Design a protein with these regions (language model features):
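"Short basic amphipathic alpha-helical interaction patches in structured regions
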Residues: 79-88, 98-101, 112-114, 141
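N-terminal targeting signals for export/organelle localization
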Residues: 1-52
Length: 155
């Protein structure tokens, strides 16, 4: 894991969410959570977002909220969520404006939460809000890059 004293709150928040599944009685759930957690730091550190796009995104930091529906078992989720966390961190988005909601392999919500109110097709389903209004989604993989797709949604 990243140094607990020197890493973004948004990453710590994800670690806390994944830790719930690490302690699951269901060994498959625990195994997928471990796989996700083990790769999270590497994906977060290695992703190099476009700095010019990040500079444009920073002006939206206080306007944006992101809710992600994902599955620990999903390779797209395990790749895109750490990258998204890095983009949000460099944008200056507060960790309390980021939420992650888990679904199982049949895409049923793990908890009775935001995911339960949505029709879930592909994951991750990244739902982007600007000033409390949903402005769009990035589903499964970005069209260009996470930061470019976010900028297009927030303009």
């Amino acid at each position: 894991m990243l140094d607990k004293n020197n890493h973004p709150d948004i990453v710590h928040k994800m670690e806390m969410i994944l830790a719930q599944d690490l302690n699951s009685d269901d060994s498959a759930t625990a195994d997928w959570a471990k796989t996700f957690m083990d790769g999270f730091e590497t994906e977060f550190k290695n992703y190099q977002p476009d700095r010019k796009v990040l500079d444009k995104l920073k002006k939206h930091a206080t306007e944006v909220e992101v809710k992600v529906i994902g599955g620990n078992w999903c390779s797209d989720t395990r790749r895109e969520v750490p990258r998204l966390c890095k983009v949000l961190y460099f944008m200056g988005v507060s960790a309390d404006k980021y939420s992650y909601f888990r679904v199982d392999k049949s895409k049923k919500p793990v908890d009775n939460d935001f995911a339960a109110s949505r029709t879930i097709g592909s994951v991750p389903d990244i739902v982007v809000y600007k000033n409390g209004v949903e402005v769009g989604r990035i589903i499964e993989t970005p069209r260009e890059s996470l930061e470019k797709d976010l900028l297009a949604l927030l303009k």
